[in-house]
């Protein structure tokens, strides 16, 4: 008589690479948050993964760049030369520092330029005591010993005057300066800022645009967090 084997958690492992890109963050969420869905599901503001992130037992992070936080102006402003990364959805399992703040990864801060630093993991792997049943969202929170860190925006919704080549910036926390490169939606060419003052910037050779309101992307403010997950999968 044929019998059907029961489904159980076995030693079979699945490895998935995931890149959290701030230009794919969920709209209206602050701090920035990401929705994780299999590649077969399409839609705006979705980070595609190979399959469902279930039964996660290990998470690995690799070095990546961040812009200077709004609270910092020089490398010496990072207390202890360290930055910590915490994922809100994983708060039941995390390290705690002497002040009781939770984190999953600790990084050494290395200066790269006047506007960016590189984060080098002190220990790049976090092993979960209990497997995480499912991961659908990830909300990374950065902080140092002075508290949470906020970052300049990498995407701005702006108004443009195509005749005068003026773009009016609606907010201040963009940290754009003369010579910075930006990307204007609808025009596939890296533009260079000519001047920037009084909350108006001047772009070289900007073409006529179909709409006065466009998106302006700022590469130096973009954050991409490379993560690697190991999951235990059910076998029959």
From Swiss-Prot:
It is found in: Virion. It comes from the Viruses. Induction: Expressed in the late phase of the viral replicative cycle. GO terms for cellular component: virion component. Keywords: Late protein, Virion. The keyword ATP-binding does not apply. Its main location: virion. The keyword Transmembrane helix does not apply. Belongs to the asfivirus H240R family. Forms the penton at the fivefold vertices of the icosahedral capsid. Together with the minor capsid proteins (p17, p49, and M1249L), forms a complicated network immediately below the outer capsid shell, stabilizing the whole capsid. This is Penton protein H240R. It comes from African swine fever virus (isolate Pig/Kenya/KEN-50/1950) (ASFV). The lineage of its organism: Viruses, Varidnaviria, Bamfordvirae, Nucleocytoviricota, Pokkesviricetes.
